[in-house]
Curated annotation (Swiss-Prot):
<comment type="pathway">
    <text>Carbohydrate degradation; 2-deoxy-D-ribose 1-phosphate degradation; D-glyceraldehyde 3-phosphate and acetaldehyde from 2-deoxy-alpha-D-ribose 1-phosphate: step 1/2.</text>
</comment>
<dbReference type="InterPro" id="IPR006124">
    <property type="entry name" value="Metalloenzyme"/>
</dbReference>
<dbReference type="InterPro" id="IPR017850">
    <property type="entry name" value="Alkaline_phosphatase_core_sf"/>
</dbReference>
<dbReference type="GO" id="GO:0006015">
    <property type="term" value="P:5-phosphoribose 1-diphosphate biosynthetic process"/>
</dbReference>
<dbReference type="GO" id="GO:0009117">
    <property type="term" value="P:nucleotide metabolic process"/>
</dbReference>
<dbReference type="GO" id="GO:0008973">
    <property type="term" value="F:phosphopentomutase activity"/>
</dbReference>
<feature type="binding site">
    <location>
        <position position="10"/>
    </location>
    <ligand>
        <name>Mn(2+) 1</name>
    </ligand>
</feature>
<dbReference type="GO" id="GO:0030145">
    <property type="term" value="F:manganese ion binding"/>
</dbReference>
<keyword id="KW-0963">Cytoplasm</keyword>
<dbReference type="GO" id="GO:0006018">
    <property type="term" value="P:2-deoxyribose 1-phosphate catabolic process"/>
</dbReference>
<feature type="binding site">
    <location>
        <position position="284"/>
    </location>
    <ligand>
        <name>Mn(2+) 2</name>
    </ligand>
</feature>
<feature type="binding site">
    <location>
        <position position="289"/>
    </location>
    <ligand>
        <name>Mn(2+) 2</name>
    </ligand>
</feature>
<dbReference type="GO" id="GO:0043094">
    <property type="term" value="P:metabolic compound salvage"/>
</dbReference>
<keyword id="KW-0413">Isomerase</keyword>
<protein>
    <recommendedName>
        <fullName>Phosphopentomutase</fullName>
        <ecNumber>5.4.2.7</ecNumber>
    </recommendedName>
</protein>
<dbReference type="InterPro" id="IPR010045">
    <property type="entry name" value="DeoB"/>
</dbReference>
<dbReference type="GO" id="GO:0000287">
    <property type="term" value="F:magnesium ion binding"/>
</dbReference>
Length: 390
């Protein structure tokens, strides 16, 4: 039977959605498009061969005559532009009410409860860039042991701790405490551990030991349907965290995009059946939020250079799906995600070549198609386009 290798290139949007301005974004945001404008020499030949430049509305790449895959783009139906919302929608959940955000920081009651249960004082408690806030409070934390708490435009409760001051296990335990607190009326989509190292301002750097503590999905996803059918759901990167482990049969966390590709390949080489579901987060975390278009461009080129290896390790019936989960235009103001169309590229030995899938009304169509390919129950939301692929 077919096996699906599903890779999320985190935040690689391809242009503003019609409602982008309602989410605080300009109609000119385009993660990939604006990177191309700054770096027209970007080399992503393998994604171009898959048809990324042939997607409707993409005018910054020349289209190619004979793409080797199917290609298209999806709108987001959910009310959000974050990781949780994007991944949940692509697996069949429409988030019709935005997750709660805390634009002025967390209430006195929340912070006092957190301090009481963790035994540590809080500093920060405001929306901030993660790299900026560790510079602001990193030295203070070394002196006092106080924990840095902050949020963003997303629905997140983030805890930053120097690994040399607060051990990782304590940081992770504090996140579990925060997850218990941030429920009900105060429910945030994710509590995030943000460990870093360094001795003084200007030298603090995040480590790769991040962990996300998500809400449980509101209803069954495609992942649950695949697992319940007795197939594998193998999660690479932060996929396990995004779904709080629901619908996952095995998982591995990763240190970088290239580590994510390596672990995806490791799973591909094993005797399994079902779904390998990978998230490559560096595009978003290292380059999108930090507004680093040059770094983003290099990361895209690095991923693109690994695609031949991924394709070479596919079995006869394997199907490769590559898509994003939202945008994060590194040329745009601020540090937050951007609400964009996402690209979809699909490849396999038995898949049509050069077929334009057009524009899909929801990310959930991707998950419905994955379910259909694997002959399992379709999710509540989304329409399969499997019939267009063969």
């Amino acid at each position: 039977m077919s096996r699906v290798i599903w890779i999320v290139i985190d935040s690689v949007g391809i242009g503003a959605l019609p409602d982008a301005e309602k989410f605080g974004d300009s109609k000119d945001v385009s993660t990939l498009g604006n990177i191309f404008k700054e770096y027209p020499d970007i080399q992503i030949p393998n994604m171009r061969n898959l048809g990324i430049g042939n997607i409707d509305g993409i005018d910054f790449f020349e289209s190619i005559k004979e793409p080797i895959g199917c290609f298209g783009k999806c709108k987001e139906m959910s009310q959000g532009k974050d990781t949780t919302t994007g991944h949940w929608e692509m697996t069949g959940i429409i988030v019709d009410k935005p997750f709660k955000t805390f634009e002025h920081g967390f209430s006195k009651e929340i912070i006092e409860e957190f301090e009481k249960k963790t035994g540590r004082k809080v500093v920060g408690n405001k929306p901030a860039s993660g790299t900026v806030i560790i510079d602001e409070y990193g030295e203070h934390q070394i002196k006092t042991g106080d924990v840095i708490v902050y949020t963003s435009a997303d629905s997140v409760f983030q805890i930053a701790a120097n690994e040399e001051v607060i051990p990782l296990e304590e940081l992770y335990n504090m996140c579990k405490i925060a997850r218990e607190i941030m429920m009900g009326d105060n429910a945030v989509a994710r509590v995030i551990a943000r460990p870093f190292i360094g001795k003084k301002k200007g030298e603090f750097v995040r480590t790769s030991n991040r962990r996300d503590y998500s809400l449980d999905p509101f209803e069954p996803t495609v992942l649950d349907n695949i697992k319940e059918s007795g197939l594998d759901v193998l999660a690479v990167g932060k996929i396990e965290d995004i779904f709080n482990g629901k619908g996952i049969t095995d998982a591995i966390h990763t240190k970088s995009n290239m580590d994510g590709v390596d672990e995806t390949l490791n799973y591909m080489k094993q005797d399994n059946k079902g779904l390998i579901y990978s998230n490559l987060v560096d595009f978003d975390s290292k380059y999108g939020h930090r507004r680093d278009p040059e770094g983003y461009k290099k990361a895209l080129e690095e991923f693109d250079s690994r695609l031949p290896e991924i394709m070479a390790n596919m079995r006869e019936d394997d199907i490769l799906i590559i898509n994003a989960d939202h945008g994060n235009d590194p040329t745009y103001k601020g540090t937050d995600h951007t609400r964009e169309y996402i690209p979809v590229m699909i490849y396999g030995n038995k898949i049509k070549k050069g077929f334009n899938l057009g524009v899909k009304d929801t990310f959930a169509d991707i998950g419905a198609t994955v379910a259909d390919i694997l002959n399992v129950k379709l999710p509540k939301h989304g329409s399969s386009f499997k019939g267009d692929l063969f």
